[in-house]
C-alpha cells in the first residue's frame, strides 16, 4: 500500500494538485502500472481519511489539545515508530514544521499503514503527504520537502 501512496503523491497530487480526481480512472491507471487492487483501494481509503482529518471532519480531539502538552506514545505506536522516528517527529515539532494537530495526523496515518514498522524515510513521506493540503502549512511543507530530498554534498574532513 505504501508504494501506491508514494506513486499517487508523486504522479497525481504533487505534480497536478488542482486536478479533479476521477477515482475509477486513477484505480485503472494504478492497476495498469502493476499495483494490486487491494493495495490501491487501501491507499485510496487512507488518503480519504487523511482528507477528512485535514478538513476537521474526523478526530475533532486534534483541535482541542494543549499545544504545550508532551506527547506520550502508546506501546503500539512505539512498536511502529522506533526511537529514530519518534526523535524525528520531536525534531519537526522543535523547528515548527509540525504543530500538535499535524503531528497527531501524522501519527494517525502512520498507524493506519499496513506496515508493522515504519522507517525514517517512510515517515518523511507521510509527513510530506499530511502537510500537503493543510491550509497555513505551506512553509512547513517546503521545509519538509527540503528535508526529504536533501542531498548531502559536503565532504568529510
Curated annotation (Swiss-Prot):
Belongs to the Smg family. Coiled coil: none annotated. It comes from the Bacteria. It comes from Yersinia pestis (strain Pestoides F). InterPro entries: Smg (IPR007456). This is Protein Smg. It holds the Pfam family DUF494.
Amino acid at each position: 500500500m505504501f508504494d501506491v501512496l508514494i506513486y499517487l503523491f508523486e504522479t497525481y497530487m504533487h505534480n497536478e494538485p488542482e486536478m479533479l480526481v476521477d477515482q475509477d480512472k486513477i484505480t485503472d491507471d494504478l492497476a495498469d502500472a502493476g499495483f494490486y487492487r487491494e493495495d490501491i483501494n487501501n491507499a485510496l481509503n487512507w488518503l480519504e481519511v487523511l482528507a477528512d482529518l485535514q478538513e476537521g471532519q474526523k478526530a475533532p480531539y486534534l483541535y482541542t489539545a494543549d499545544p504545550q502538552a508532551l506527547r506520550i506514545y502508546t506501546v503500539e505506536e512505539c512498536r511502529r515508530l522506533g526511537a529514530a522516528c519518534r526523535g524525528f517527529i520531536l525534531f519537526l515539532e522543535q523547528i515548527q514544521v509540525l504543530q500538535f494537530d499535524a503531528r497527531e495526523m501524522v501519527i494517525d496515518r502512520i498507524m493506519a499503514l499496513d506496515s508493522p514498522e515504519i522507517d525514517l524515510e517512510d515517515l518523511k513521506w507521510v509527513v510530506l503527504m499530511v502537510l500537503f493540503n493543510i491550509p497555513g502549512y505551506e512553509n512547513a511543507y517546503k521545509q519538509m520537502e527540503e528535508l526529504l530530498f536533501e542531498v548531502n554534498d559536503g565532504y568529510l574532513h
